[in-house]
Amino acid sequence: IARRQEEGILHDYLENSLLALTDWIANVFRLAKRLEAYEGDAVLQRDLKALPKDIQNAEARLRLENDESVRREIRQVIASKKAQKQNLEQLQDVMEKAEMQLENSLTALGTVYSQFLLLDAKKIDDARARGLAQDIRDEVDALQNVVTTMDEVYGRTI
């Protein structure tokens, strides 16, 4: 579409929009790969399921234990397992938000695609093209923020 436009402001906006769209698609791909890695991580999934029961078992053992040095060790195990559970729950929350952002981005990509087709069909004015370009930049920035947050949280947890 941008190549078919005559040189000028609209052409420049469309070219810039296409570059931003490329970044957007790259971020969508990175986000999808990160989600796929998370969902395929058997250790994380196993720990998410096992930790509540492990904590309960350790707390039950603590109630039955009389030796103070063993009780101290059990308390440390419980604290460690609770911290691990909290970190995994935070990771799970981030991943759920990322999944919603991915879904939102894919929907927005479909919208942008149809807007580009409208641009071509109607040869709309520069103001609308500027608005579309800004929408794309905003979506790219939002998705980049999610990917960066996921990189930080996922990298810190594993």
Language-model segments: which ranges?
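Membrane-proximal, non-transmembrane interface segments of integral membrane proteins
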Residues: I1-R71
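Long amphipathic all-alpha helical oligomerization modules
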Residues: A60-I158
